[in-house]
């Protein structure tokens, strides 16, 4: 396998996490959450550029994987779930796992529900050609989840 393909597969599958046989999207989301909480530098000023960089990388590698597999949003591509989780955690203010276990767990479950259910306009967004459609539907799932989590924890 050529080095470019290896790099593409490594990024798109978040270091091969996307190749687990059962529920790769859920496992990818969980891997993203774990990495988020072990990342050093718990400030938005540091994290935001990392998230933006991974979003841009995701645009490219998701498009390349779609082209290679001839499938829309292949199961092994989980960088979109990872970036979606990271955006969600930024939007709900979760930087430290130990301080926000209920909020983190709620966010994770809601993100997976919204990502799987594809509540409008996610179906339309998912149909956008290439990596943009792959990445954006998870961004929308993150936004929907953040709205619900923030409302729930505001009123609790």
Language model features: what each stretch is:
Residues 29-33, 48-55, 101-112:
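Hydrophobic core segments of alpha-helical transmembrane domains in multi-pass membrane proteins
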Residues 36-49, 88-103, 150-156:
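Helix-coil boundary and interhelical linker segments in multi-pass alpha-helical membrane proteins
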Residues 2-27, 60-88, 112-143:
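Interhelical loop and helix-boundary elements at the membrane-water interface
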Residues 44, 48-68, 153:
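Hydrophobic, well-ordered secondary-structure segments
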């Amino acid at each position: 396998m050529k080095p470019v393909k290896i790099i593409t597969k490594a990024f798109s599958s978040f270091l091969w996490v996307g190749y687990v046989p059962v529920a790769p999207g859920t496992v990818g989301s969980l891997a993203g959450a774990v990495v988020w909480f072990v990342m050093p530098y718990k400030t938005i000023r540091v994290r935001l550029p990392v998230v933006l960089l991974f979003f841009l990388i995701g645009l490219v590698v998701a498009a390349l994987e779609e082209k290679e597999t001839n499938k829309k949003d292949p199961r092994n591509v989980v960088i979109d779930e990872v970036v979606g989780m990271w955006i969600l955690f930024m939007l709900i203010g979760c930087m430290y796992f130990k301080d926000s276990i209920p909020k983190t767990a709620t966010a994770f479950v809601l993100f997976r529900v919204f990502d799987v259910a594809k509540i409008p306009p996610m179906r339309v967004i998912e149909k956008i050609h290439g990596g943009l459609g792959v990445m954006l539907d998870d961004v929308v799932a993150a936004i929907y989840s953040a709205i619900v989590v923030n409302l729930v924890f505001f009123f609790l």
